[in-house]
Swiss-Prot record:
It comes from the Eukaryota. This is M-zodatoxin-Lt8m. Expressed by the venom gland. Belongs to the cationic peptide 06 (cytoinsectotoxin) family. The keyword Magnesium does not apply. Residues 1-20 form the signal peptide. It comes from Lachesana tarabaevi (Spider). GO terms for biological process: defense response to bacterium; killing of cells of another organism. Keywords: Antibiotic, Antimicrobial, Cytolysis, Hemolysis, Secreted, Signal, Toxin. Insecticidal, cytolytic and antimicrobial peptide. Forms voltage-dependent, ion-permeable channels in membranes. At high concentration causes cell membrane lysis. It is found in: Secreted. One of its GO terms (molecular function) is toxin activity. Residues 21-60 form a propeptide. Pfam families: Latarcin.
Length: 131
């Protein structure tokens, strides 16, 4: 359970990194510099900082590929977990559960797992947490 939560947190972190806005290129920075006719030192420092972001673009590409691999593995793990839970919970064969899971979308599978683990955690909570 702990590993599943950690893996889910990593997937969410990589999703944020992969979907973030790409950094401005050096060519675009030169255009901005010409348009704004930098007179203020703070603006020059800001543009220097943006010029350093080109390295981040390469890193984003690396994390984007890594994110795709992790996401693929996480999806496979979620499919297996959903099948396992259905077999145990509903008392059906593994093939029937696999057919049900295959018919579900990824979003439905995630919601099914969150609902299952949410109920499980709700039952395990300490009694003094009641409000």
């Amino acid at each position: 359970m702990k590993y599943f939560v950690v893996a889910l947190a990593l997937v969410a972190a990589f999703a944020c990194i992969a979907e973030s806005k790409p950094a401005e290129s050096e060519h675009e920075l030169a255009e901005v510099e010409e348009e704004n006719e930098l007179a203020d030192l703070e603006d020059a420092v800001w543009l220097e900082h943006l010029a350093d972001l080109s390295d981040l673009e390469e890193a984003r590409g690396f994390f984007g590929n890594t994110w795709k691999k992790i996401k693929g593995k996480a999806d496979k793990i979620m499919l297996k977990k959903a099948v396992k839970i259905m077999v145990k919970k509903e008392g059906i064969s593994k093939e029937e559960a696999q057919a049900k899971v295959d018919a579900m979308s990824k979003k439905q599978i995630r919601l099914y797992l969150l609902k299952h683990y949410g109920k499980k955690l709700f039952k395990k909570r300490p009694k003094n947490c009641d409000q």
